Amino acid sequence: MIKLKNLERRYPLGKEKFFYVLRDINLEIAEGEFVSVMGPSGAGKSTLLHILGMHDHGWEGEYSLNDTAVHHLKPKERATLRNEQIGFVFQQYHLLDDLTVYENLEIPLSYRRYSKSERAAMVADTLDRFQIVGKKDLYPRQLSGGQQQLVGVARAIIAEPKLLLADEPTGNLHSGQGEEIMELFRKLNDEGVTIVQVTHSEKNASYGKRVIQLRDGWVVNK
C-alpha cells in the first residue's frame, strides 16, 4: 500500500549545509497493517506522518500510495488523493469550534461526490456507530476531551479512507479514554483499515502488529 524509497526531508542551514529530519527512508507498509512509529523526541516521527498524509511537500525521494506515484503528482493532485484515501486523527483533536458535531462529521464528505441525502445518511450512521447521536448538536467546547477525540476518530473514518494516520491520538486523554480510542483503532484495523500511528506509548504500540523505530531521522529497524 505504502512504498517509500530513498526518502529524505531536510532544511537549509546555510551555504551547502542542511539539517536532516529524515534520512534515506526505505519502507513498505502493506494494506491492512497496523504500524506504530516510535522513537525519541526529534526523531522525525511526526514529519514522516505529515509526508505520508501529503501535508508536507518539501521532501525528496519516492513515495507510492496504492501504486500511485505521489512524487510525480502536483500539489492539487496530491490534495485530491489525500481527501479520497486518507483520514487523520491528531492529538489536539482539530475539530472546528464554530461547527457542531454533526457539521464537523460532514466536512470530509464535502470533498466527495455525495448527494445531500447520502451525506445525511452517512453522518447518521456514524453518529449511531460511535454512540454520539445525543451529541450531534453540541459544539466541541461542550464535550470532554475523550468525547472530542471520539468525534475526531469518527470524522477521520466517515468517508471510509483506505489509510488512517494518527499522531499521538491519546496524548491528551486519561488512561480510560485512551484505552477506548485504542480499542476502537483495533476494531477498525480488524475491519481492514490500514493504520499508521505515531506514539511514545509502548502500550499503544502493542495494539499494532509492527513497530518502526526512528532515531535522528534514520529508521533503525523495520
Segments from the language model and where they lie:
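The feature captures the beta-strand-to-loop junction immediately N-terminal to the Walker
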Residues: 38-40
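Helix-to-loop junction immediately C-terminal to a conserved catalytic motif
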Residues: 53
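Conserved ABC transporter NBD signature motif
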Residues: 61-69
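Short coil-to-helix segment of the ABC ATPase nucleotide-binding domain corresponding to the Q-loop/switch region
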Residues: 99-107
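Conserved ABC ATPase signature
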Residues: 139-143, 147-149
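A short, proline-enriched helix->beta-strand linker immediately N-terminal to the Walker B motif
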Residues: 158-162
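Catalytic Walker B motif of ABC-type/P-loop ATPase nucleotide-binding domains
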Residues: 164-167
